[in-house]
Amino acid sequence: MRHIVLGCLLTLFSTTLFAQLKTDLALLNLKGPVKKWEMKVTDLRNSSVLKHKITHFNPQGFKIKEETLDSSAQTKNFVYDEQGRLIKVFWNGDDAVLEYSYRTNSDGTLTVIEKQKFKDSESRVISENTYDKNGLLIIKKEADDSCENECEKLENGMNKYSYHYDEHGNVVEFKNELFTVEPVKYTNKYSDGKLIEQTEFSYGGKEVRTFDANGHQIQFEEFPPLGFGDGSKSSVKRWKKTVDNYGNVLKDEEFDEANEPNSTIVEHSYEYY
């Protein structure tokens, strides 16, 4: 009995200590047991469909198939192992395959290694992402084929970035760890523990995003860098959201700063488990 109890404690300890990746539903801010999500962008001037996509999820909240139904029609498939971890992504009619492996680190973080493979060719590592115990991305490495200067700084041909978060799990800094580049910084405002406004500071300018109670963006304001204009807002976008009982968006209407509607509308529909 003592060994059984010890084993249970070790299992509990390992699941709480080591990183657990966020589900696709959480990353997409989709609520409830979503089984299928359909998204369509329509140009109201001529009723033409500009974008049409259907995404299917398993009961655990991860993508299993993504169908693009517009002019670039294709189907993206997601394969998982017996532990529910993503191990392969492939496209119908395409010989490109993405393969994933996992490394648990001594500090409790989890590194996901992404390899790209084409038919009759060696696989190549294109990214290594490390997540903390809360499933937050903290280190991002990605293949940098466009490097022109000081390329010897790259780590195995990859650039390296770090993410830093506040106590609510929202990003406050995004930084290049290999090259001298001014980091992108964020300030976050909350109401009752929910993010209601995020300001991004980068390249001397700033962008302000406002969110509703469901976490959906409802306003975007852009301020140009100093020396470009008088420092006032250069553009404003607002969105009117119609949501279902779960708080998922059914209709997304965009308006400019004069409250004039955009010529496109985004509509969503869902199937639930």
What are these model-derived regions, one by one?
Residues 20-273:
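Buried hydrophobic residues that stabilize the cores of well-folded domains
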Residues 1-23:
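Bacterial Sec-dependent N-terminal signal peptides
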